[in-house]
């Protein structure tokens, strides 16, 4: 059985036991997190939401809160001695999908 959930403005296909990385969630490590925005549930019986499936949810456990690799943003204006160098690390949450309730 699999489901398509929406989190962080993205749609992600998940299965039970799968580990996924999503945009940062406000939860601590070891906490249980429930996704209520389930757009599609597949398997033996297919349920398509309009826009979400009524009564469906996906439960996950938070494994880790972290930050991604650093990217460098460098801008300059030629002949003006104007340059700026910035770095950015995107925060993420690592989850393990425990159960899909449909």
UniProtKB/Swiss-Prot annotation:
<dbReference type="InterPro" id="IPR001787">
    <property type="entry name" value="Ribosomal_bL21"/>
</dbReference>
<dbReference type="InterPro" id="IPR028909">
    <property type="entry name" value="bL21-like"/>
</dbReference>
<feature type="region of interest" description="Disordered">
    <location>
        <begin position="79"/>
        <end position="102"/>
    </location>
</feature>
<dbReference type="InterPro" id="IPR036164">
    <property type="entry name" value="bL21-like_sf"/>
</dbReference>
<dbReference type="GO" id="GO:0005840">
    <property type="term" value="C:ribosome"/>
</dbReference>
<dbReference type="Pfam" id="PF00829">
    <property type="entry name" value="Ribosomal_L21p"/>
</dbReference>
<comment type="similarity">
    <text>Belongs to the bacterial ribosomal protein bL21 family.</text>
</comment>
<dbReference type="GO" id="GO:1990904">
    <property type="term" value="C:ribonucleoprotein complex"/>
</dbReference>
<dbReference type="GO" id="GO:0005737">
    <property type="term" value="C:cytoplasm"/>
</dbReference>
<comment type="function">
    <text>This protein binds to 23S rRNA in the presence of protein L20.</text>
</comment>
<comment type="subunit">
    <text>Part of the 50S ribosomal subunit. Contacts protein L20.</text>
</comment>
<dbReference type="GO" id="GO:0006412">
    <property type="term" value="P:translation"/>
</dbReference>
<feature type="compositionally biased region" description="Basic residues">
    <location>
        <begin position="79"/>
        <end position="91"/>
    </location>
</feature>
<keyword id="KW-0687">Ribonucleoprotein</keyword>
<dbReference type="GO" id="GO:0019843">
    <property type="term" value="F:rRNA binding"/>
</dbReference>
<keyword id="KW-0689">Ribosomal protein</keyword>
<keyword id="KW-0694">RNA-binding</keyword>
<dbReference type="GO" id="GO:0003735">
    <property type="term" value="F:structural constituent of ribosome"/>
</dbReference>
<keyword id="KW-0699">rRNA-binding</keyword>
<protein>
    <recommendedName>
        <fullName>Large ribosomal subunit protein bL21</fullName>
    </recommendedName>
</protein>
């Amino acid at each position: 059985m699999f489901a398509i959930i929406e989190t962080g403005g993205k749609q992600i296909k998940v299965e039970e036991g799968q580990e996924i990385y999503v945009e940062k969630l406000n939860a601590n490590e070891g906490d249980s997190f429930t996704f209520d925005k389930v757009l599609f549930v597949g398997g033996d019986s297919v349920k398509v939401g309009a826009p979400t499936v009524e009564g469906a949810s996906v439960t996950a456990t938070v494994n880790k809160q972290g930050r991604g690799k650093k990217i460098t943003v460098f801008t300059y204006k030629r002949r003006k001695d104007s340059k700026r160098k910035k770095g950015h690390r995107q925060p993420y949450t690592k989850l393990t999908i425990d159960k899909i309730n449909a």
